[in-house]
């Protein structure tokens, strides 16, 4: 749970967020100048995460894109991806420029918080706490995307997103040109203009340097523009709307698919409806069981969202120990453990993940003690070190919600 620097230093406080929500949130863009004493992520951290993200390219359904001169690279993409020997974004730029003089490039990575890792994610969550306390969490998701390179403008052109965006400038000079919604015809999320001609009437430029944060609401059209040189930025998108029916359908589908495994796929249908079956009997039974468990599944999903600050993809801490009855365990002082019961099931959620266990008073007392800041041990909770308590503590260790404490340190903390 430790960070090289205190993640709470990225909490801007209630006074800042009170003024921000009143003046800007969902209303108009702004630039937040140098809000942190230390950058939320260093250029070295971001470049190392870029290298780690290249592993995704080797998967079938990846969300990493590299473009050169505005064209997405496909077959030989690994030739141009960042490498450790590049050393930095500047080194990658020099390598591409040497091979392709005069060319520009862009690297895009979706859900980049996974590669940036646990410490970075804790900093972002602390940044969001004050905003969420005033406006609530986005019902769909929060996500960090990487935009990096020497590109002259956003490949997508002028467009709107369904998210409110905080753009953290990591390296270089970042410019986002924005227009209010009324500047262009209605018709969804519209992409234009072709060629080099871009309308500027009615636009505003958000210019940021390393350490600044650019903000624009989802209602604003926007496009990234070059101010010269390479730039690296992290866009934190907050996506506010989620479909209740869509969420339920996804949860039902996921649970049934897990149970069916390879039997979840059919290859063909009969030529005559006389031979048609709605689904194999095993599949129908799986659908029925998933439907019966829907209330628990929905509660777990929402608790995962809340405990994970709305991030759908969350990193894990690097160090996770074994559960021992003699050890003392203490909870994260920054982010609490959540508990809810649905019927006879207890749901525990922490750091964007959850577990469902049989409800018990002993389990509830353990979670309450941890959230009060009281270290706990299995030997002190129950004579036999109840298997469900072990499972709960193993889950909390896995998610980084608790850590072991020496007896002496724990006694000082009481």
Regions found by a protein language model. Give the residues of each.
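Active-site region of the double-stranded beta-helix
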Residues: 2-23, 36-42, 47-210, 222-268, ...
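A residue-level signal for conserved active-site and pocket-lining positions in enzyme catalytic cores
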Residues: 32, 234, 396
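Long, charge-rich alpha-helical interaction segments
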Residues: 250-309
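Acidic, low-complexity/disordered tracts enriched in E/D and polar residues
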Residues: 290-370, 394, 405-414
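Short capping segments at the starts of secondary-structure elements
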Residues: 368-379, 402
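Short amphipathic alpha-helical interaction segments
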Residues: 383-398
